[in-house]
Amino acid sequence: MALVKIHGITKEYPEGTTWMEVAREHQKEYEYDILLVRVNGKLQELHKQVKDCELSFVTAKDKPGMSAYQRSASLMMLKAFYSVAGAGNVEKLMIDFSIGRGFFVEARGNFVLNQEFLDAVKAKMREYVERKIPIMKRSVSTDDAIELFEKLGMYDKARLFRYRMVSRVNIYSIDGFEDYYYGYMVQNTGYIKHFDLIPYHYGFVLMMPQMSDPKKLPAFEPQEKLFATLTESSLWGKRMDLENVGALNDRIASGQMQRLILGQE
């Protein structure tokens, strides 16, 4: 049995009980969904099993909880997009930057990116929410991660991992669709209830709730000047072959850092 202290009260739980089960017992005490827990002050995901500790709950009203929500929603969106478009038709799908209280996603490939297409992606996302698909986590070697992302056509990530110093990385998946995320996730897709996809320029904006009101989507506020500036920065990176950290590492490793600095100046 594990002794778990919650709100000053200690209760016994059988070994093998998950934090998800404990969270369900206390969900009625919270206005917003419990997404993570703090075990002796350290964050853990809900699939972890109980142990002797002092426990507190993290909801979408807390920064770590909202971050987990947004990561999980991003992964679910990517899976839905690839499913609707067909994996072989997606040339590029990347969350570039935040804009207008949302996240701008650049999308290129053999598809027509319009409202009808995005409505199909949203419908697929809602299907995943209804199914409450577990978001699985596995640890793999860095070499295996490189091989995986090359196989999936995610060459930017494979390029990045070639310079990673640690020997293992965490891979998250939804129903077989895998990607790398640095940070915690919610337990299943059923928690990702609020989202929207809005066409914008050469991509779309993924809208998600804010900590101020986790049950409501903020209005999208186009910011044309900021978008133009961020787009110009992205285009400059492409011209310099510096679209991501992996590309920057390549230039540093090849001894071109001084030339790069002069070019930027």
Regions found by a protein language model. Give the residues of each.
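Short secondary-structure junctions
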Residues: K28-Y32, V84-V90
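Active/ligand-binding-proximal structured segments within catalytic/core domains
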Residues: A23-H26, M66-V84, I95
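Short aromatic-centered micro-motifs
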Residues: V4, V37, D179
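Short strand-turn-strand beta-turns centered on an Asx-Gly dipeptide
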Residues: I6-I9, R38-G41, R108
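Auxiliary tRNA-acceptor-end handling modules of aminoacyl-tRNA synthetases
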Residues: D52-A68, A80, N89-G100, F104-E265
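Short, contiguous acidic and Ser/Thr-rich linear segments
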Residues: G8-T18
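Short acidic beta-strand-loop surface patches of small beta-rich interaction domains
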Residues: I34-K48
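Short amphipathic, charge-patterned alpha-helical segments
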Residues: T17-E29
